[in-house]
Structures are given as structure tokens and as C-alpha cells.
Amino acid sequence: MATDQKRGLLIVFEGLDRSGKSTQAKRLVESINKKSTESGDASSSPSAVLQAFPDRSSSIGKLIDQYLRKEIDMDEHALHLLFSADRFSKNQMIRDNIAKGIDVICDRYCYSGVAYSLAKGLPEQWVRSSDVGLPKPDAVLFFDVSPEVAAQRGGFGEERLETATIQQKVAAVMPTLRDDAYWKTVNADGDLDSVEKNVFRIYENLDREKPFESLEKI
């Protein structure tokens, strides 16, 4: 990394299914790249990239996608490790982009993996250990919406984990994963534009000067 170039940021969007996080993650990437272009940045590289987890286009992600779409069944322990493997497959990509000064915006990350596996009753210590060593986010934006409101939004129920019972359990687990040092709560009940402005305010106040770290615990 050039000495005069600040590193990129790793920002994670988390929340229940249909909480609006995917839409807002895309909007943040678009806003960052638009602002960079308007400021006269002549670089051919984007200023921000979006990474969704699972990556359903990868070989690992395709298996996960088949499970989520109810096309295949799978042991829950194997599924948890597949989700972790999917994230680790992007480990170097994330680190390389951060080193180049490119922000990486993740639609879900290890916290979803932990929350869903705990909601399904897998052993806590084992579940929490499988993602240790991944890049540590500079911020986790948790989209706060009730399971009841999320269930009323379009598309809910199309995939295996989109059930009221699982979503309620995940909603109960997520706060136990929170680290106030870098977790931020976003009220997801507002309109798209107001939520987007709130997200961008959080983004603009993040610190690029602090060292980039790896997760030591979850």
C-alpha cells in the first residue's frame, strides 16, 4: 500500500431476512463509487465493491444455494462448515482490496452463520470457532426490524430458513453477538432514502487510520 494511501474499510450488513440490508448494501457501494467519480478520482478501480455471503456463483455457494432453495438436504454441521468455507474463500480478496484502499461491503458475514446455527441448536463453542481468523469488520451495521415486520415484506418464505420460528430465534441470538466497539444499529423501519442517509453518515465517520485486524473471537 502506498504510504500516502489510506486503507479500505470492511463494512458488514447484518439483520434478519427481508430487513432491507441487501438493498442498502448495494446503495452504499453505489454512493461511494459515485462520490469518488465526482471527486475526480481517475483510477480504473472502483472505490468500493460488494460481496454477498453466501456467494451463490461459487462452487461452494452453489451447494448452499441448493440447500436454501430446498433442492437438497444436508447435515447441519456440514452446512455450517460450508458457510464458513464460503467466507474463507473470499479472505484474500477482502484483504487485497483493503490494502489497495478499496472498501469492501459485505451483505451478511460470519455473524449470520453463527446466529442461524445457534438458532438451530448446534454447539455454541464449536459454532463460534469456525470463522476465527477472518478479517475483522470496521463496522457491523445491524438492521433492526421485528420478525413480524420482515415476514410481511415481499418474497419472505421462499427459502428454507425464512420461517417465523427460525427468524424469531435468530432475532434473539443476534444481540448476544454484538460488540459495541464496532456494531451500529440501523432502524430498518424507515423509508429507503432515510435509511440510506443514516448508513452513509455512519460510513463517513469510520476510522481508516486504525490497524486492520483479524477476528480473534465471535
UniProtKB/Swiss-Prot annotation:
CDD domains on file: TMPK
Residues binding ATP: 15-22
Family, similarity comment: Belongs to the thymidylate kinase family.
Domain of life: Eukaryota
Catalytic reactions on record: dTMP + ATP = dTDP + ADP
Cross-referenced HAMAP family: Thymidylate_kinase
EC number annotated for this UniProt entry: 2.7.4.9
Biological role: Catalyzes the conversion of dTMP to dTDP.
Molecular-function GO terms, alphabetical: ATP binding; dTMP kinase activity; nucleoside diphosphate kinase activity
Protein name: Thymidylate kinase
Involved pathway(s): Pyrimidine metabolism; dTTP biosynthesis
Encoding gene, per UniProt annotation: dtmk-1
GO CC list: cytoplasm; mitochondrion; nucleus
Keywords: ATP-binding, Kinase, Nucleotide biosynthesis, Nucleotide-binding, Transferase
Signal peptide region: none
Single Gene Ontology BP annotation: dTDP biosynthetic process
